[in-house]
UniProtKB/Swiss-Prot annotation:
Belongs to the RNA methyltransferase TrmD family. Specifically methylates guanosine-37 in various tRNAs. The keyword Transferase applies. InterPro entries: Alpha/beta_knot_MTases, tRNA_m1G_MeTrfase_C_sf, tRNA_m1G_MeTrfase_TrmD, tRNA_m1G_MTases_N, tRNA_MeTrfase_TRMD/TRM10. Keywords: Cytoplasm, Methyltransferase, S-adenosyl-L-methionine, Transferase, tRNA processing. It is an enzyme of class 2 (transferase). This is tRNA (guanine-N(1)-)-methyltransferase. Its EC number is 2.1.1.228. Its main location: cytoplasm. GO terms for cellular component: cytosol.
Length: 225
């Protein structure tokens, strides 16, 4: 997978890709990530990427021109499966979406700022709009990082144990149940006996039951899907 991120704050994005799972994926050659500073594509001396909204109102709006030039440049070099805009009014990211999107080859992620981008960007360039929740952040960079992490960990070969991703919360619309590790008895707080029984069929059944109960208590809406 190749991910091209368009941003006005590339320095905000770099460090998460230099550690942990995302770094491992890059080092293995399983994913390529590139940052494109939108200010490099402006045609004005000030390198500004925003202007006042037509009709007045609070805030600034990101210009069409630098976004057009950046996306057009990238598309001249390769084909992209999706051009994604991170925005609070997009479809809310979920596990089903990341499962399917992890199979894509090349994607562009546009990080918004200020009041957002000129609507013509959304009309003519964006193929998918994604939100990470019903709240507003200072920019789309943190949302882009969430999306990247959620996608990259699903790429085959990234996790040392590929079955780990398949048993995460939200797979099969269930939250993960309780998990335990050693010691089996700590200050009298004991691990459920079934988990140390060695009876794998019973363990699987216990985990399924716990996942269902946990989901019913915490996120009953998931069971309606």
């Amino acid at each position: 997978m190749r991910i091209d991120i368009i941003t006005i704050l590339p320095e905000l994005l770099r460090s998460p890709f230099e550690a942990s799972i995302m770094k491992r994926a890059i080092d293995k050659g399983l994913v390529e990530v590139y940052f494109h500073n939108l200010r490099d594509y402006t045609t004005n001396k000030q390198k500004s990427v925003d202007d006042y909204p037509f009709g007045g109102g609070a805030g600034m709006v990101m210009n069409v021109q630098p976004i057009d030039d950046c996306i057009t440049h990238l598309k001249s070099e390769r084909t992209y499966d999706e051009v994604i805009y991170m925005t609070p009014d997009g479809e809310t990211l979920n596990q089903k979406m990341t499962n399917s999107m992890s199979l894509l080859g090349n994607i562009i992620i546009l990080c918004g700022h200020y009041k957002g981008v000129d609507q013509r960007v959304r009309d003519h360039f964006i193929t998918r709009e994604i939100s990470i929740g019903d709240y507003v952040l200072s920019g789309g960079e943190l949302g882009a990082l969430v999306l990247c992490d959620a996608l990259i960990r699903l790429i085959p070969g990234v996790l040392s144990d590929e079955t780990s991703a398949l048993t995460d919360s939200f797979q099969d619309n269930l939250l993960s149940g309780p998990i335990y590790t050693r010691p089996a008895d700590y200050k009298g707080w004991k691990v459920p006996e079934v988990l140390t029984s060695g009876h794998f069929a019973k363990i699987d059944k216990w985990r399924e039951d716990m996942a269902y109960e946990h989901t019913k208590n915490r996120r009953p809406d998931l069971l309606d899907n």
